[in-house]
Amino acid sequence: MDTFWWRAAWGLCLVQLSLAQIDLNITCRYAGVFHVEKNGRYSISKTEAADLCKAFNSTLPTMAQMEAARNIGFETCRYGFIEGHVVIPRIHPNSICAANNTGVYILTSNTSQYDTICFNASAPPGEDCTSVTDLPNAFEGPITITIVNRDGTRYTKKGEYRTNPEDINPSVVSPSSPPDDEMSSGSPSERSTSGGYSIFHTHLPTVHPSRPRRPWSQRAENTSDTRDYGSSHDPSGRSYTTHASESAGHSSGSEEHGANTTSGPMRKPQIPEWLIILASLLALALILAVCIAVNSRRRCGQKKKLVINNGNGTMEERKPSGLNGEASKSQEMVHLVNKGSSETPDQFMTADETRNLQNVDMKIGV
């Protein structure tokens, strides 16, 4: 019993230690825009995203700022919060990132936790990969915050940046799962050794259709799940495609630089348990019916044979009748013989012939 309580206390301490530590992986800054991942998974809510950017002396970027950063090389393979949207900036098509689309890919989903994207107005206008060594707007707290830069350098600080009590003590312990096509930041070549993100430039083959194309047009075909598609426009007049999270089926679309087609894994329909149980019961009933039918056939199949012999009775009965000139009375002898009896029909025929011969001899003697 003491061992159980000791292990429980040790496990509780480990849980508290894990909850008291936060790792923040950040990318380079592109026109002030950078991506932040918390604890290696989607675990940042919308309110925490704003607090985290504020701790970095930054804000959530707008769509125009995202487009400007993408134009100079900013792209990721994970969803992140911006002002009013959840997006992935893509420059090169990749089948596991943003459904093989390019541009600022907007997601519409019910999932509430993602990464975040921040914008620092004081950052250089181009690409800046210098290490971040401070969390200037973090206040005092018991949490150990570690900033992991793209080059592997780390900066650790005690403090807190979250202001929403639900973010500090979430009611749901398990983190929300990301969409199927963005389970990680990409292949190992697309991630840095420190756990952050590297900007990758992977050129995939692009198919150019012969028919005219509309920019950023999407259509759903052969879908197995319901998806919501729409479009939004920013004040500058640009049009962005909005997609729902795709978990199965196929989608295809054409873009400004070509058409890209992505295919998701087809999900096999799940067989209900009640249907399996019903099929098992029916099979069992069929087997029992066959057994009962075979047993009944064996019982009813024991046929009985009637062997009828015409005889005239015993010797004593036949003598007076023969002397008096009366007609001999015939007597029928009926033998019931089972099909499985040890005596064969030939034996019965032999006995009958013997009796008939005796009758004939007696008549001749009289």
UniProtKB/Swiss-Prot annotation:
N-glycosylated. O-glycosylated; contains chondroitin sulfate glycans which can be more or less sulfated. GO terms for molecular function: hyaluronic acid binding; transmembrane signaling receptor activity. Residues 156-165, 222-231 have a biased composition (Basic and acidic residues). Residues 21-273 are extracellular. SUPFAM superfamilies: C-type lectin-like. Hyaluronan binds at R41, R78, Y79, Y105. Residues 295-366 are cytoplasmic. PROSITE patterns: LINK_1, LINK_2. The chain crosses the membrane at residues 274-294. Glycans are attached at N25, N57, N100, N110, N120, S185, N222, N260. It is found in: Cell membrane; Cell projection, Microvillus; Secreted. Mesenteric lymph node and liver, not in heart. It comes from the Eukaryota. Residues 156-266 are annotated as: Disordered. InterPro entries: C-type_lectin-like/link_sf, CD44_antigen, CD44_antigen-like, CTDL_fold, Link_dom. Keywords: Cell adhesion, Cell membrane, Cell projection, Disulfide bond, Glycoprotein, Membrane, Phosphoprotein, Proteoglycan, Receptor, Secreted, Signal, Transmembrane, Transmembrane helix. The modification Phosphoserine is found at S296, S321, S330. The modification Phosphothreonine is found at T314. The lectin-like LINK domain is responsible for hyaluronan binding. Cell-surface receptor that plays a role in cell-cell interactions, cell adhesion and migration, helping them to sense and respond to changes in the tissue microenvironment. Participates thereby in a wide variety of cellular functions including the activation, recirculation and homing of T-lymphocytes, hematopoiesis, inflammation and response to bacterial infection. Interacts with PKN2. Interacts with TIAM1 and TIAM2. Interacts with HA, as well as other glycosaminoglycans, collagen, laminin, and fibronectin via its N-terminal segment. Interacts with UNC119. Interacts with PDPN (via extracellular domain); this interaction is required for PDPN-mediated directional migration and regulation of lamellipodia extension/stabilization during cell spreading and migration. Interacts with RDX, EZR and MSN. Interacts with EGFR. Interacts with CD74; this complex is essential for the MIF-induced signaling cascade that results in B cell survival. This is CD44 antigen. The lineage of its organism: Eukaryota, Metazoa, Chordata, Craniata, Vertebrata.
